[in-house]
A protein has these predicted regions:
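Short, hinge-like loop/turn segments at secondary-structure boundaries
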Residues: 46-50, 104-108, 133-135, 156-159, ...
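A conserved helix-loop-beta module that forms one wall/lid of the active-site cleft
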Residues: 23, 27-34, 77-149
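Phosphate-binding site of ATP-dependent enzymes
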Residues: 151-240
Length: 334
């Protein structure tokens, strides 16, 4: 398999682990910065150039699109899809998961539990919004953000109002979310690959910090998810349409609550906490995905060829009228 990994930095742990896992299984791997691609849009001829040269044979694309380049990165991913190249994850799924509000809307439509979330844009709406999420403390989030960036806690109604007004003045779209006190600064991160949880860990925020992200100094330990939590993680990834996902869950009084879904989950923390070869699991799923696609294509080609043979056979018959208005078909050249 010729695998293309879209990543701005080949030295990142997650990128280098995916490259190592793929090469150890005999695959050829190229790492390319999404911003270095040139997209050619033409009727019937979508194309891509990398560093001003046409891209070579690519069997599958594995995107690692950072939040800072979401728009152009998704355009590159969509172009590969238009060219018929399999992508693990596709642009629509990535875009869904990046928009926190959209993700919550889709999850609740499928009856998947999430923290109570409110979106508003006027100062007059703050008081009601705060009541809807259960008062303070409350969580204020930018609609797009990763690794805990853009996630804040407001301890008082005045702090909520000040935060919201400041963010709105900067043109930011935000959501207000209930604070799940029983989680005690901890959450669960489950890595879902191909519809199953391959690894999971519990993350605990450091003292004085409410965000449990490892990039924010949190600690982690391996955990075996019970059935309800594993099912919730798998269902959340499925709703987004993600083949590979990092699903963050809170342990609420009533059970799992989906906090966030990441289309490019970091591998360092989860692999070190669990000793699970997550990168290998992702590459193995890419192999299965490509194999299924190849088999479907072969079956489709067989059907098309069978239809062509049938058409040729029908065209080779000559209708001959006989007495009584009946016809007899004779094979041409017989």
């Amino acid at each position: 398999m010729n695998l293309l990994v879209l990543s701005r930095n080949p030295q990142l742990y997650s990128t280098s682990r995916l490259v190592l896992a793929a090469r150890s299984r005999g695959h050829t791997v190229t790492v390319a910065d999404p911003l270095e691609f040139r997209i050619v849009i033409a009727k019937g001829l979508p194309a891509m150039f990398l560093n001003d040269a046409p891209i070579g044979r690519t069997d599958l694309v594995l995107p690692r699109i950072g939040a800072s380049i979401t728009n152009y990165g998704l355009a590159v991913v969509r172009q590969f899809d238009m060219m018929g190249v399999p992508v693990l994850n596709n642009a629509v799924a990535i875009a869904r998961s990046r928009d926190k509000l959209r993700a919550m809307q889709l999850l609740t439509k499928k009856q998947i539990d999430v923290p109570i979330t409110v979106c508003a844009r006027t100062p007059e709406s703050v008081e009601l919004s705060l009541k809807l999420v259960g008062g303070t403390p409350a969580i204020v989030k930018l609609q797009q953000g990763t690794q805990g960036i853009g996630t804040m806690i407001a301890e008082t109604p005045q702090a909520v109002t000040s935060l919201l007004e400041a963010l709105w003045a900067m043109g930011q779209d935000i959501v207000l979310q209930e604070y799940i006190s029983e989680a005690r600064g901890a959450d669960l991160r489950a890595i879902v690959v191909g519809g199953r949880v391959v690894a999971a860990m519990r993350r605990q925020a450091r003292a004085g910090e409410f965000r449990s992200n490892l990039h924010r100094g949190g600690s982690s330990q391996r955990v075996d998810l019970d059935k309800r939590y594993a099912q919730a993680a798998v269902a959340a990834a499925k709703v987004m349409g993600l083949e590979v996902a990092g699903v963050d869950l809170l342990e609420g009084k009533s059970g799992p609550k989906i906090l966030e879904i990441n289309s490019s989950p970091g591998l360092e923390g989860i692999e070190r906490a669990t000793s699970v070869d997550v990168a290998g699991a992702i590459i193995a799923h890419a192999e299965r995905l490509l194999l299924r696609r190849t088999r479907r294509k072969n079956r489709k080609d067989e059907v098309i060829e069978g239809e062509r043979r049938t058409t040729r056979m029908r065209e080779s018959l000559i209708p001959i009228p006989v007495a009584g208005g009946k016809r007899v078909n004779l094979v041409r050249g017989a």
